Amino acid sequence: IVAASTSSSAVRGSTFNIIFLDEFAYVPNNIAEEFFSSVYPTVSSGKSSKVMIVSTPHGMNMFYKMWVDAENKRNDYVPIEVHWSEVPGRDEKWKEETIRNTSEGQFQTEFECEFLGSVDTLISASKLKTMAVESPKRSGGLDVYNMPEKDHIYTMAVDVSRGLSYDYSAFVVFDCTKAPYKVVAKYRDNEIKPLLFPSIIERVAKHYNKAFVLIEINDLGQQVADNLQFEIEYDNVMMCTQRGRSGQVLGGGFSGRGNQLGLRMTKGTKRIGTSNLKSLIEGDKLIITDFDIIAELSTFISKGKSWEADSGSTDDLVMCCVIFGWLANQSYFKELTDVDVRGQMFTEQQNAIEADMA
């Protein structure tokens, strides 16, 4: 019998018949993934080996995904839920007293077993609950939900990291042919180096009908954008123009004064991107079925006058979506796709008001 804290190397090199994981939902996502990568060969090698996972929910993480997959019979785990009302002596009076001494949110998580994310999230909790997760077709780190279709228009939003383990380089591919838009593929890797990232971007973008690519160029993003455009010679890298106090606008890809490859993320562009992303998702104009994006959205919270990942969480995929939110608000993008989502949403809202007044 061995007792150990959960880490990537906790049981490596050992053989166990039963592995019991307590409060697994509270293990950080990156450690949980590394732990299962090392422990599963140990478990699968024995005919009678078992894994038991016991935990109260803690947002949308690896435990949440395993639980949902078990409920939908997408894995071989057996889900067992113990509700507070099944414990003798606990009734509505006990519930009211407990909420009074803690909080509604704590009670929902600890006793109702609700998978709540962080508070003050960009996307409302009620909307996050209704966002359905689909299983992707996996291929070398790229999660694919829809294969490219002829004559469809695709855009790719790219967020670049330094290639260190705590940060991910990521991109998300969107089908922009018509509203609602849809996430059709996503990639993220916390070890890919900026020198190699442009080759992966180019390969996937070409596959998706030579997708238009918009790269966030803060820090090492500029290097990735330059390599993609000038060394690999990928033509559909989007450019932005600086318009003084008006900020950046999406351009047509012609070089000139004030033009730059990619988007520089500033307070202004982030404010527009987050606001538009919220409108798109909550207005059902952007369909996201990727678990990792939804999980990041559940911990993407308000901090001061901005939005960022909650402590211990990441937001690389969400920032790709924020880039797309900014992009979808640009006049040049509407010309490329011939889809004015803001106009559609305004018309639908007006029709709803008129219907209520009728």
Predicted regions and their residues:
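Mg2+-dependent endonuclease catalytic cores in nucleic-acid-processing enzymes, primarily RNase H-like
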Residues: 60, 69, 177-306, 356-358
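Catalytic acidic motif of RecA-like/P-loop NTPases
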Residues: 25-26, 162, 219
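Conserved RecA-like ASCE ATPase "motif II neighborhood" in helicase/translocase motors
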Residues: 1-42
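Acidic, Mg2+-coordinating catalytic module of metal-dependent nucleases/exonucleases
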Residues: 305-337
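Acidic two-metal-ion nuclease catalytic site recognized across multiple nuclease folds
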Residues: 186, 324-358
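ATPase catalytic-site recognition across NTP-hydrolyzing enzymes
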Residues: 34, 86-160
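Short regulatory helix/loop adjacent to the ATP-binding pocket of P-loop NTPases
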Residues: 59-75
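Structural recognition of the conserved hydrophobic beta-strand(s) that form the central parallel beta-sheet
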Residues: 2-3, 48-56
